[in-house]
Amino acid sequence: MNKPVLVVMAAGMGSRYGGMKQIDPVGPNGQVIVDYSLYDARRAGFETVIFVIKHEIEETFKAAIGDRVSKAMNVKYAFQQLEELPAGYTVPEGRVKPWGTCHAVLAAKDLIDGPFAVINADDYYGPEAFRVMYDYLSTHEDGSYYDYCMVSYLLRNTVSENGSVARGVCVTNPDGTLHSVTERTRIEPYADGVHYTEDGGASWTDLPGDTLVSMNLWGFGKSFLDEAENRFAAWLDANLPTNPLKCEYFLPLVVTELIEEGKAKIQVLRSTDKWYGVTYRQDKPLVVEAIARKTAEGQYPENLWA
């Protein structure tokens, strides 16, 4: 069994943030959020990282992150390009948005030779998540079904005071495996707790603060790549006619199909760490403050890659 590798999705556009938030410094020596994720991942056992980026930001990204991290990890690059579609499909006129998280992972398909974890470049996950993820991937292989996992967080630890966030709301089975994950694209805190809307704010539904949510920290076997690739054309057929410019091929979509078909079980691992991220530019001071505090407490050295 090959050692688990880490896939970092860093090709997103940062539309709500307004800029390349993947490389916006938050640490005392110019570190960005993913520096801390990679430091935690390296301590947990991950030795190889595959960055999924766009060709246009390659040089900037390498200078800001990749070259620095390469002192401590084996760094590889994959490129998520709009034109990477199944035979017979073309990019709709006017489309600039990437095809989503599942498409990002498929961009790295040729570089993945065993189990792998997936993270967002612009989310701070905390050390616990990488420990439980690496341990699981190192000790589980596909058997009569695909044996995957995800790390869940408590909803109250993952909201932004500065606006809405999108989260995958998880329902678990009695044995701790994932029953379903539903993408809620507009979740907001309010005076009495946390709620979400699906109709532009006309009506709201409360969610308990201890609801388990996905932050796109998934653990898969290589089998997932074939499943995702084989389902892509059917997904395009179903979505391009109605939403050609904005539809996205999300990881939870394929996960849900595999669960419903009885092909996969997804163990729900848990982290009680608080999430930090920069969905909005106003979130940045909170992240800077949190990193400074964790550095002062000794959780991280001032220079991560010295």
Role assignments for model-derived ranges:
Residues 172-174, 181-306:
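Conserved alpha/beta core of the MobA/IspD/sugar-nucleotide pyrophosphorylase nucleotidyltransferase superfamily
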Residues 87-98, 163-168, 282-286:
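Short, surface-exposed amphipathic charged segments that create phosphate/polyanion-binding patches used
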Residues 125-126, 220:
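Hydrophobic/aromatic residue at the end of a short beta strand that borders the catalytic acidic motif
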Residues 127-215:
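Conserved core of the sugar-phosphate nucleotidyltransferase
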Residues 61-65, 133, 287:
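Hydrophobic packing residues within well-ordered alpha-helices of enzyme cores
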Residues 114-124:
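Short beta-strand-to-loop acidic/aromatic patch adjacent to the donor-nucleotide binding site
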Residues 69-114:
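Short phosphate-binding loop-to-helix
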